[in-house]
Amino acid sequence: YYPQLNTLASTLAVRYPQDRRVVELYAKHLIASGELEQALALYKLHLDDQPPVEEYFRSVIDIESYLQHPDSVNRYIGHALELFPGQVDFHLSKGHTLNYSKQYPQAIKAYKQSLGYARTDSLRSVIWGFIGDTWHQKATAGEQDIDDDFARAVRKGSFRADMKQCYKAYDHSLRYDPDNAMVLNNYAYFLSLEGRDLEKALTMSSRAIALTDNNPTYLDTHAWVLFKLGRTAEAKKVMQQAIALDRQESAALLVHYGDILHAMGEQFMAEIYWRKGLEKGYDADQITRRMEQG
């Protein structure tokens, strides 16, 4: 029925060009048909409608983001904020785009500006989580692998200060929503990588997995905290569960399991999982180093 639907949608668009229902119908038809560029052009055609329509700007920003056009995203976010300065999602989109472009201080500023328009504690918690994540990205900028390059990142002069701000932001987030599972997980994981406050990390990780249904990433964090606490047998059991649930076959999870097996003296199986991690894209130098040290 595609030809008939296409004819109907295009006919309606020509006959009722200013009807929002028709514009949305035609745009959604184009998107469903894989014609993203045409849908984008249609939305852009209506950005000057009076009164301006927020949803058209959101759609343009979403499609430009999907197409990975950061310059265009910035331009349309700027236009949207001029027209709708109180819309928190446009401020968040600005923060996400700046983060994607690795402009971390500017992203943090945009996220903080969005806090002024947040109306619920749940949203404030999410935003503070974004701020914490961005401070962490700034702290480890330039390091290819978060686990193995963490020690090298620590030696950077700004690392401690940036991570202090990261944890401070997470604390703000959890004051607004103590059950923000993503923040609990990230907070616990980064503490485990630094090897500090491990009992606190374990409490947060335990809460994160209690709040979610078999999330392999959160189980990985829990296993890693247990591993850092020296509870390797428990860590192995939890990591086995994480790997069984991980349909993406994350390289980090495979390598983590290899590290746990290595610590338990199961070198042969450890190397198997390290190699699996390598096949999934884990840094080759880090795998080589593990093999040589094994």
Protein language model regions, located:
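Alpha-solenoid helical repeat scaffolds
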Residues: 1-268, 274-294
